[in-house]
A protein has these predicted regions:
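N-terminal secretory signal peptides that target proteins for export/translocation
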Residues: 1-6
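Bacterial N-terminal signal peptides
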Residues: 10-21
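Ser/Thr-rich, Pro/Gly/Ala-heavy low-complexity intrinsically disordered linkers and tails
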Residues: 19-46
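A cross-family phosphate/adenosyl-ligand binding-site feature
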Residues: 46, 50, 68-130
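Active-site histidine-anchored catalytic micro-motif
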Residues: 46, 137, 143-174, 178-184, ...
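Active-site-proximal beta-strand/loop segments in catalytic clefts of secreted hydrolases
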Residues: 53-56, 81-86, 117-120, 143-147, ...
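Mobile, glycine-rich extracellular loop/lid and propeptide segments
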Residues: 58, 62-70, 126, 131-133, ...
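Electrostatically charged, flexible surface regions
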Residues: 90, 197-298
């Protein structure tokens, strides 16, 4: 389906990203990394506490685009805690303790304060919960936006692992869910031009649809939501499908580097692989303990 508030979100995101490109957001007015308060809360509504993380690293384009999009809404209270360097394909790996995790105060590419954690994506979540949320936990963890799709529960030939299992973006989200915090993992499709702006629109739309439930603590945490957004080189995103993870890939899509056909007319697409590569945003549940993430935390 095409969501009715997409145009308004596109305009808001475009404005926010344009201001960021002009340097209007580089003054770091969102707060200080390493403190419990960041982001705007001047909208008069209850603030939504959002922890943003990823696996591409705190300086990556995807997390920067997401944070700038979130800042458009003054009711979003944003804290960023992400790996200091690129930790792609680290799944739900965590640094053995002791020693304690280390982090440095840094910023996103547009200058928003962040904690750069010397560790994996799951470590970044743990660091934030233990050091940056001293009073109340976040209402939600947003992991992404990843630079490359994460679709399918099928072997991709990388150490004989499965696509959703090796994703640090998904691993961070599962870690949050295992700790009782709702989480969304978002990934932008590969292509000549990575369309993070469309990814931001879809994440913000998900956030608005779930804002009331997140504030009320009513979003289930037995699974996380895995959102994949096409980067259309031609045509337009066809809509969104709520579909399960694919368990096979009979059409031979290149799951890691394959481009998406947004001009496709294929219908009745049964899973995330078929939906995504035929131009749809796909939303799929991933069990939080799929790879024993929760068991490792207990």
């Amino acid at each position: 389906m095409i969501h009715t508030n997409r145009i308004q979100l596109v305009l808001a995101v475009s404005l926010g990203l344009a201001l960021a490109a002009l340097g209007c957001s580089s003054d770091g007015d969102g707060g200080t990394a390493g403190t419990g308060g960041a982001g705007g809360t001047g909208g008069g509504n209850p603030p939504l506490r959002i922890l943003v993380t990823n696996d591409d690293g705190v300086g990556s384009a995807g997390i920067d685009a997401l944070v700038e999009g979130l800042r458009v809404n003054p009711d979003n209270e944003i804290i960023v805690s992400a790996p200091l360097i690129n930790r792609t394909s680290s799944g739900d790996m965590m640094t053995p303790t002791p020693p304690p995790l280390e982090a440095m105060e840094t910023t996103t590419a547009s200058g928003y304060p962040a904690a750069g954690v010397d560790g994996f994506p799951a470590d970044a979540v743990m660091y934030a919960l233990e050091n940056l949320y001293l009073d109340e936990p976040p209402h939600v963890v947003l992991s992404g936006i990843n630079d490359q799709q994460n679709v399918g529960d099928v072997d991709v030939g990388v150490l004989i692992r499965l696509q959703v299992d090796i994703s640090g973006t998904i691993g961070a989200a599962k870690t949050a869910a295992c700790l009782g915090i709702p989480a969304l993992a978002s990934s932008q499709g590969d292509g000549e031009e990575i369309d993070f702006a469309s990814g931001v629109v879809e994440v913000l739309e998900w956030l608005e649809e779930n804002r009331a439930a997140l504030l009320a603590g009513e979003v289930p945490v037995d699974s996380i939501t895995n959102l994949n957004i096409p980067s259309c080189q031609s045509g337009e995103i066809r809509g969104q499908l709520d579909v399960p993870l694919a368990t096979e890939n009979p059409n031979g899509w290149d799951l890691v580097n394959g481009s998406q056909n947004c001009e496709s007319t294929e219908a009745d697409l049964p899973n995330d692989i078929e939906g995504f590569f035929n131009g749809y945003v796909t939303s799929s549940p991933v069990p939080r303990n799929k790879t024993g993430t929760c068991d490792e935390l207990n």
